[in-house]
Amino acid sequence: MKKTFYITTPIYYPSDKLHIGHSYTTVAADAMARFKRLTGYDVMFLTGTDEHGQKIQRIAREKGMSPKEYVDGIVEWIKDLWKTMDISYDHFIRTTDAYHEEIVQKIFMKLYEQGDIYKGEYEGWYCTPCESFWTESQLVDGKCPDCGRPVERVTEEGYFFRLSAYGDKLLKYYEEHPDFIQPESRRNEMINFIKAGLEDLFVSRSTFDWGIKVPFDPKHVIYVWIDALSNYITALGYMTENDEKFKKYWPADVHLVGKEIVRFHTIIWPAMLMALGLPLPKKVFGHGWLILEGGKMSKSKGNVVDPKELVDRYGVDAIRYFLLREVPFGADGVFSNEALINRINSDLANDLGNLLSRTVTMIEKYFDGVLPKPSSQEEIDEDLINVAQNLPQKVEEYMDKLQFSNALIEIWKLVSRANKYIDETMPWVLAKDESKRGRLGTVLYNLAESLRFIGILISPFMPNTPKKMFEQLGITEDLTTWESLKFGLLKEGTRVKRGEILFPRIDVEKELASLEKKTEEKTKETKEEKIDYITIEDFSKVQLRVAEILEAEKVEGSDKLIKMKLKVGEEIRQIVGGIGKYYSPEELIGKKIIIVYNLQPRKLMGIESQGMLLAATNEGKMALLTVDKDIESGSKIS
């Protein structure tokens, strides 16, 4: 019976199309899944989409669509992207799948019935893009510590998960399982986070309805992280009659995630599993970001690289190779067109492509395209053979540590050694001496056999290139398995045939100029597209008024909020504004400012705010909008 291996990616949030950073995670998971299949494992590879939440509901409403209609379109694009990227997932889960929703409700009910979930009132800060709740002390400059975007103050009745009860258990688990969180730096971050004190987690929302209903209280929907994290077990049939896959594959061997969501996967998710009495995943690996000059790629910032465009231009294997080779998997890396092109030219065109081309060309030229029989091996041959024979074990060791870059570096040592072997043995010189024909045959056989090893070992990283290599070398399927990685199995008499160049060289200067021009055009188009025009009728719905600040005081418990009493004509209003880091209460009194007069009141830290003041912000600065002449409070602005 085969050993099992269960690997997952995060399920991606389909608020917009995905970028190369998402492909990075998924290509890495795919390479690992393919490698484990190659080495004889029964693999389960899961990916999918996390489709609920307030942000999706807002975007869909803006586009005049239902949330389900909106995500359906994005999901089709994502599935097409994974097809383009040669992703060999075994199951694609959507959190809108009926079976997932049903199991999530069962999980919520179980946790509620055993006392791990209870009803209460939440008051704090909420980041809509991240779907995350934060305390005042966790904010960085008053913004979300994960994404750096503004947060909203919310007061809401709902359900809480007793996360605080699991802090000591989590720390003990980390101590007993030192490899659970990788790399080591992420582990230390999580230990420090827990030691600072865990607060109970708000796990339902009632201010929007795009989500899975709390089964016994349907005006609440289940908080997106409880919903999303459960996918790793709902996809296997947990809590159903058909739970064979769950029994077979759980616990997961590795959750691959971006470093920004390690906290959810190593604190919230394990605590949930402990509460459910289930074993924890064996490893959570939080990889770094692919960064463009100027910062992390982000759909909301618009500074993303479209993987489909890259594949159209350079081919899928070149992109997969670059992603896995360029940056050590746990670290951040910078994506640039120049680095990509140089990597293609150097490693793929010059090293691998030339090795195949030279080998096949020489076999055709000197042996009419028929692989010769090797004769006795000399010391220089044994050196090449040893590099090849020792390679599978080294690659396996690196892959088990998720060190994709190091695994590829090892494979390229054989590529380099084989190229050097050509220069050392000089087949073109041997061909001139008939008495050296046997020696020439040995050299060319060793090169072809080295290429067979290379093709097998790069297949998890670059699924298409080995097929082209094997076709040119005449290698049959039985000699492309892990078990066939024994030097000397390639059959003499095999017919080779030159094919297309694996990776044509790219003119770096011309290509960069072309890409720069294309980027400029795209940026111009994007800027034009991003103006979200409204009609005069839309604007006329907003009532702006001049208001005079009569009183101002800090809101207790917040360094950001100021409560102000305003005179708006004959009316006195109260507004709460997040301007405490830029203005003292004293300097506000007497100012005439602009407010949104007809905004629906809402509570901030339990204090009702009857409108919203207007301010300009830029690069950490803020300035209130005021009037340049003395005018009566209550005056309308049009």
UniProtKB/Swiss-Prot annotation:
SUPFAM superfamilies: Anticodon-binding domain of a subclass of class I aminoacyl-tRNA synthetases (SSF47323), Nucleic acid-binding proteins (SSF50249), Nucleotidylyl transferase (SSF52374). Residues 538-638 form the tRNA-binding domain. Pfam families: Anticodon_3, tRNA-synt_1g, tRNA_bind. A motif ('KMSKS' region) lies at residues 296-300. GO terms for molecular function: ATP binding; metal ion binding; methionine-tRNA ligase activity; tRNA binding. GO terms for cellular component: cytoplasm. It is found in: Cytoplasm. Zn(2+) binds at residues 127, 130, 144, 147. ATP binds at residue 299. Its cofactor is Zn(2+). A motif ('HIGH' region) lies at residues 12-22. InterPro entries: aa-tRNA-synth_I_CS, Anticodon_Met, Met-tRNA-synth_bsu_C, Met-tRNA_synth, Met-tRNA_synth_2, Methionyl/Leucyl_tRNA_Synth, MetRS_core, NA-bd_OB-fold. The keyword Transferase does not apply. One of its GO terms (biological process) is methionyl-tRNA aminoacylation. Its EC number is 6.1.1.10. It comes from the Bacteria. Keywords: Aminoacyl-tRNA synthetase, ATP-binding, Cytoplasm, Ligase, Metal-binding, Nucleotide-binding, Protein biosynthesis, RNA-binding, tRNA-binding, Zinc. Binds 1 zinc ion per subunit. It catalyses: tRNA(Met) + L-methionine + ATP = L-methionyl-tRNA(Met) + AMP + diphosphate. The keyword Nucleotidyltransferase does not apply. Is required not only for elongation of protein synthesis but also for the initiation of all mRNA translation through initiator tRNA(fMet) aminoacylation. Belongs to the class-I aminoacyl-tRNA synthetase family. MetG type 2A subfamily. PANTHER family: METHIONINE--TRNA LIGASE, MITOCHONDRIAL, METHIONYL-TRNA SYNTHETASE. Homodimer. This is Methionine--tRNA ligase.
